[in-house]
Each structure stands twice: as structure tokens, then as C-alpha cells.
């Protein structure tokens, strides 16, 4: 046993070192209404290609609005390559000074040193934007000190975990056939004057709708109308009534401070190609930062750099890509797979 101990310690040390061996991707803004704001984006899902969506959104907010945007990914601890869905996300300590968390994860069970900064951020009531699978962003064993963040947590004090208690809803199920049904996004008439909706029109998402029944106190801004095909012009699915697709709420933090939250059940990488949906996300960011007075219906939401989302059609994810391969304004998102 004495002989084994040094080896075990060496393995543990190596594993911890590997977990932290990927440098974060940072887009440094220069000027704009969000100048000086620190935004942290966490991307690690298995299906909807958050590793494409969040870097592009971060670029838009950095270049057009002046924010400093740090993008974190699920990382293969041995290679440093982006590994979507991997429960290893180095760099979450950036949340210590963050003004906003944008999260797009699915079924994560992070090591304590990576999960604790997220908990600390929520405990101080930091604003949160959650996209698509963030409603079931954590899947954590019952014996973990972070078990209450699990999307199926049963305890009444934090029922259904991070999704329900912070974002306003957990995973309920698909609403219509995913990959066969896209989603028209309609503004709720009673919410039309809300700042987040300024300039938003003709919004559409490639992804199918989710069942969603936001927690009491949520303000529903947009509903999802399932379509029978994968084009904005596809016919309406007459068997499906509108379902909540985007809402706002305030969550109560451990510090007692109320934290702003915006949630959308859409957000696949291809959804950002739609001007209406992209504006919705940009406006939601400014609102989350308390900058709603800066939201104008004609604010710049143009794409930054080559953006080629690949969710629709089931294209394979590019492999052997590191965060630094996405640096700067002009690198492709994502680059071609390395040969």
C-alpha cells in the first residue's frame, strides 16, 4: 500500500492538472454599452452544438457592444480538445468577477473545483441566461454536495434543481418531433412592450419546441408554435397549441439578492442564423446586465466572422479543435476538422 500511495497521488495530481490545461477563449470588446462588463459563456451539450452557438454570440456582444466575453467549453482532459458534453469545464473561476453567466449545458456533473464557482455566482444573485438544454444542464448523483442542482432533484427546498429554481423550468419533454419540426416564435401580445422584444420580428428556430410550464412569477415573452417541417415557411402543426419558449424571472439567491434570469427553450447553433432570434438573445443580454435603456430596435446584431452552424442535417461535429482555434474575429466557427 505504501508503494501504491505515491503513484495514486501522482495520478490524482496529473488528473487535476489535465482538467485545467485548456486556456479560456476570450473576446475582448473595445467600446459599446456593455464596455467593462465581464460575460462568461459555458458551452457543453451533447446535441445542439453550443460550442458553435456561444462563441458566435460572444463575438457579437464583444465586437458590437464592448463586453469582455470568456467562453468555456467541455474539454477532453488529456488532449485539450473541445469535447461537447464532457463534464470537465476548466475556467469557471472566471465567474468570480463576472457580470453575467450565459449557460448552454446538458447533464453536467462537474468536479467540485469547477462547480463551486457556479454555485458561488448563483449565491450572490448574478444574472443568468439559459439556452435550450440548460433547463436540464446538470445531472448530479444524490450523494454529491451539489445534488440539489440536478434537474430531477426531489427536495422541496430546490425542487427540480437549477433548471426549475434558477431558470424557471426543468426538462419536461419534446413538443413535437425533434429534427422534423422547427419552431415559429411569436411575441406574446401582452408582453410586446417589454425591452427584450424591441425590434424582434420574424423569429424562428431550427430546433423543435419543448414542453415548458415556467414556474409561477415568470413573465412569458415568446411562445413556440411547432411547424410541420424544417423551414420558416413550413405549415403550422395544427395539433399543437403554442407553448412558452422564452421568459424572464427573478430567482432568490442565498444572499437574499434577486437575480435576473432569461430562459429560452431554443438556441441550437443554426437558430442564430435567424435575425429575430439573434436579436432576442442580444436584447436579453443587455436586459440581464441592467442595460435595457441601451436596447434599440435597430442595434447591430450582425454576425462576426465566418459562422457555419451544423446542427440541422445531423452533420458530424468537428474534432481535434481547441478553444484557441476560435480566437479573434475572423477564425471560422467552427474550423474545418484537422487532418
Q: What is the predicted role of each segment?
A:
Residues 39, 43, 221-223, 262-266:
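Active-site-proximal beta-strand elements of phosphoester/diester hydrolases
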Residues 23-34, 52-53, 63-67, 228-230, ...:
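Extracellular ligand-binding/catalytic regions of CAZymes and related secreted enzymes
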Residues 6-19:
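Bacterial N-terminal signal peptides
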Amino acid at each position: 500500500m505504501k508503494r501504491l500511495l505515491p503513484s495514486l497521488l501522482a495520478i490524482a495530481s496529473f488528473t487535476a492538472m489535465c482538467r485545467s490545461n485548456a486556456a479560456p477563449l476570450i473576446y475582448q470588446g473595445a467600446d459599446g454599452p456593455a464596455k467593462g462588463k465581464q460575460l462568461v459563456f459555458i458551452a457543453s451539450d451533447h446535441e445542439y452544438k453550443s460550442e458553435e452557438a456561444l462563441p458566435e454570440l460572444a463575438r457579437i456582444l464583444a465586437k458590437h457592444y464592448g463586453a469582455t466575453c470568456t467562453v468555456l467549453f467541455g474539454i477532453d482532459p488529456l488532449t485539450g480538445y473541445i469535447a461537447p458534453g464532457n463534464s470537465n469545464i476548466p475556467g469557471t473561476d472566471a465567474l468570480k468577477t463576472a457580470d453575467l453567466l450565459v449557460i448552454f449545458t446538458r447533464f453536467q456533473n462537474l468536479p467540485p473545483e469547477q462547480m463551486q464557482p457556479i454555485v458561488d455566482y448563483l449565491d450572490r444573485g448574478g444574472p443568468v441566461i439559459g439556452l435550450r438544454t440548460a433547463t436540464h444542464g446538470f445531472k448530479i448523483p444524490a450523494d454529491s454536495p451539489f445534488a440539489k442542482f440536478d434537474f430531477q432533484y426531489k427536495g422541496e427546498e430546490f425542487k427540480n434543481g437549477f433548471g426549475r429554481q434558477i431558470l424557471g423550468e426543468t426538462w419536461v419533454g419534446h413538443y413535437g418531433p425533434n429534427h422534423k419540426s422547427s419552431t415559429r416564435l411569436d411575441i406574446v401580445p401582452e408582453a410586446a412592450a417589454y425591452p427584450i422584444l424591441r425590434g424582434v420580428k420574424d423569429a424562428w428556430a431550427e430546433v423543435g419546441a419543448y414542453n415548458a410550464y415556467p414556474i409561477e412569477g415568470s413573465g412569458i415573452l415568446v411562445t413556440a408554435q411547432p411547424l410541420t417541417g424544417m423551414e420558416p415557411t413550413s405549415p403550422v402543426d395544427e395539433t399543437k397549441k403554442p407553448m412558452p419558449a422564452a421568459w424572464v424571472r427573478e430567482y432568490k439567491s442565498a444572499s437574499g439578492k434577486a437575480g435576473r434570469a432569461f430562459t429560452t427553450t431554443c438556441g441550437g447553433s443554426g437558430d442564430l442564423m435567424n435575425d429575430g432570434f439573434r436579436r432576442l438573445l442580444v436584447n436579453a443580454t443587455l436586459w440581464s446586465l441592467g442595460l435595457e435603456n441601451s436596447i434599440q430596435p435597430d442595434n447591430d446584431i450582425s454576425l462576426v466572422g465566418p459562422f457555419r452552424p451544423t446542427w440541422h442535417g445531423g452533420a458530424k461535429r468537428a474534432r481535434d479543435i481547441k478553444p484557441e482555434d476560435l480566437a479573434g474575429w475572423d477564425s471560422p466557427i467552427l474550423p474545418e476538422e484537422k487532418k
